[in-house]
Swiss-Prot record, chains A, B:
Name the UniProt record assigns to this protein: Glyceraldehyde-3-phosphate dehydrogenase
GN (gene name): gap
The family this protein is said to belong to: Belongs to the glyceraldehyde-3-phosphate dehydrogenase family.
EC number: 1.2.1.59
Residues at the active site: C141
Organism: Methanosarcina mazei (strain ATCC BAA-159 / DSM 3647 / Goe1 / Go1 / JCM 11833 / OCM 88)
Record-listed D-glyceraldehyde 3-phosphate binding positions: S140, C141, N142, T171, H195, G196
Keywords carried by this UniProt record: Cytoplasm, Glycolysis, NAD, NADP, Oxidoreductase
Oligomer status and interactors: Homotetramer.
Amino acid sequence: MVKAKIAVNGYGTIGKRVADAVQAQDDMEIIGVSKTKPNYEAAVAHQKGYDLFAPASNSGAFEKAGIPLAGTIEEMVEKADLVVDCTPGGIGEANKPMYEKAGVKAIWQGGEDHELAGFSFNAASNYEGALGRDLVRVVSCNTTGLCRVIYPIDRELGVKKVRVTLARRATDPNDIKKGPINAIVPDPIKLPSHHGPDIKSVLPHINITTAALKIPTTLMHLHTVNMEVNTDCTAEDINRIFSSQSRIRFMSQGINSTAEIIELARDMGRPRNDMWENCIWPESITVHEREFYFFQAIHQESIVVPETVDAIRAMMELESDGAKSIQKTNKAIGL
Amino acid sequence: MVKAKIAVNGYGTIGKRVADAVQAQDDMEIIGVSKTKPNYEAAVAHQKGYDLFAPASNSGAFEKAGIPLAGTIEEMVEKADLVVDCTPGGIGEANKPMYEKAGVKAIWQGGEDHELAGFSFNAASNYEGALGRDLVRVVSCNTTGLCRVIYPIDRELGVKKVRVTLARRATDPNDIKKGPINAIVPDPIKLPSHHGPDIKSVLPHINITTAALKIPTTLMHLHTVNMEVNTDCTAEDINRIFSSQSRIRFMSQGINSTAEIIELARDMGRPRNDMWENCIWPESITVHEREFYFFQAIHQESIVVPETVDAIRAMMELESDGAKSIQKTNKAIGL
């Protein structure tokens, strides 16, 4: 079988994880990754055997740093069937003409607007809608984490209303510039946060309100989720529905915080201590009549990675069944 | 007028603030404060002119440290009309026999159970119920902050349901032992947190569910509050109701986090940068039909201080009208 040729434009927090996850599949391969500067991430990409591409204007800096380049970003794009754009939020939009000119398919991350791609993706919620598409946006970590729980509950019980408070990690572990380091920041102060509307880009009929806080931690986000449903249910019903989802993982055995979740991922030998699943505490599932609550933690660096692999598979029509793609992706990365 | 004689048993985070706030009133005075160890707080209490009392068994340590004592804790209690017990949560209960033996009135903090005093106090919600009582519990910072907003909304619009997510500061600024320093801790994992039931100790008929997270910050708690009410209303209505409360302060003018609230308190010359008021962002007040949301920040070290002064005034029957006591307390401390 000829593998689908995938390029990753922007080998940063998400891009490097997407590259490794794609490379682990048997129906797609990485033909190149791009980096603007010859930093430690570029050096490791080269050591791992990825062909490295950079803007033509920066080739001198790579040469000086002793990191060999395989060509320019335009040349990388020309070689690919599909480009996963993992450049910082807002930058990806400017790359659209380049992808169109080269006639390649493109995936953007949740930092870009829905309108740029015209289709926002979550594997469990709308895989089939992405089949054969040229342009897809994989929604952000928090939106992915919420779609993964809202979709199966809506299918089985009918969702009347969702209310979420998101405690967001201030920044990623490798960032030494952003804060806060000792404050709570309602972000935004004016409700709702963008997450509620963003869920609607995948699940348009869901009535949802979200409020977000930025807090001094780097490891994971944490959601307090409240859902009203249209059907009588028990905590056991919710538990059963979540248990049926391969990308939901229950937390117990002394895991009482995001710190212990990450320690679990480290102990499991997960690459970069990634936790691709929603981490839900089953003990927190509490039902009052047709309304329930629970806590879930979301690993911002990695949760969209398996979704991106599934998006590639749908767009390249390598698999028409979403459930089969999810299973295949999971197995290949060790989820 | 003879001033009511008040002792503070436990001159720590809350106790030292209560002592200063009582001393600022014209109808009550501090006749002594107690400390178990001769640390820097004891030294400052002495420098400020408070008579200092300690357990008889620790008098040698105070002598050695050069901090003069006025007597034992039992002797302090004997001199008082009313003791404010600010010992750590759970310790206060053991002091009840001592207060009963001395025939003094007693106030406990929210760390003790409701049953210990049989009456849980919030000035705006139930001042009159404390008139002449011998034993009162002033509810905790988070419960106080919630009573202050729930009571006036319930009176004007009727509260159908309250849902709160509390992002709790991990510990106070002077604590060097507790964490987390980089994690989010659902605390407790099993819902509801104790805050919901605790609100009912003041406002028994309120339907409320609370979920709490412990996060790496020391400055303030932050609540995401959702309320369903029985009456049609607008954001302006909510704004007007909150504006009528002297212990609610609106945040604007570039105050976007708890860090900036504390900076405001420092700039205002507040003692120990205390922010006695609920800090609400009016921009966050969002109404959907008969349901609204808002953010409020709560200064855990100081919010119960004016409430404690009002509780004293009610129990000593120095003022029969709660609104007048609140006004008098506020004016004396500069709120």
